[in-house]
Amino acid sequence: HVHPLWHLGVGLLLLTGLSLPVAAALVTMLWKCVLFWASWALCRRLLGQGQKWWQATVCALVICLVSSVCINWFNPTVSLGSGTPNTWHSPTQMAVLPFSVACLWVMAQSYDRFEKLGPEQGCLTGRQWLGMAALFALSALAKPTFLQAFLPAAALFFLVQWIRQPQGSKYFWQLIGAMVPSLLVMALQFYYYFLHPTDTGIQLDVSLAKTGLCVAQLLVMALFPLFALVTDREKKDTLVILTVWNAVS
């Protein structure tokens, strides 16, 4: 399977003698717990250390339940429609969500360190580079949906920073190199789904008749991050900027 992490976890639990439904439920629950913990840590970081722990807990719970903006005439139900959770949602999507939070965190921390220490001392160490490359590759192996949105957003953000700080070219080349393994994984996944002659592939078609609907669906999902991006232009926190740009993309 081209999204093997969730299936690998289920397979390992099956070796212990558990039934398939129980193993699948436990692995899915584990990923959701990791997502909540990562969201809680993210909220503590954004709220500041002076805030109460329960405030971050409430925010993390809301984040884990948030969906697209509900417009009754467009998406009148909770369980159906674009960007909404439903009972049949892919478990591999649940597996990638913790990686999405971790990737955002690591990338933002890396750039904050670069800005603080400067081009000479702010570059990634070998261990940091390997860790970042492995994390993003694992995210792609869980499911490439996060990286499909994040990589274009991050590329635009860091291209602007590279133009502003050309003396930091070594650091930006390090970031590009760290993304290569995940890009290779995504290329293999694309080949398997769309180009490889198998019975399990996905047909890729483009329909101009549905273009307007797709734009409207994407807009509904991006309304809140777009609002945050427009109304808080002076925000300097790298983590916030990357999170919002990722949500919009």
What are these regions (language model features)?
Residues 1-19:
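Short hydrophobic/aromatic helix or loop-helix immediately within or flanking a transmembrane segment
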Residues 3, 144-150, 158-249:
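Transmembrane catalytic cores of multi-pass membrane glycosyltransferases
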Residues 16, 65-66, 138-145:
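Transmembrane helix irregularities
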Residues 26-50, 102:
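Transmembrane-helix motifs of polytopic, lipid-linked glycan transferases
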Residues 47-50, 111-131, 165-171, 240:
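Membrane-interfacial, low-structure loops and terminal tails that flank and connect transmembrane helices
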Residues 53-111, 211-218:
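Membrane-interface micro-motifs in multi-pass membrane enzymes
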Residues 128-144, 155:
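Membrane-interface alpha helices of multi-pass inner-membrane proteins
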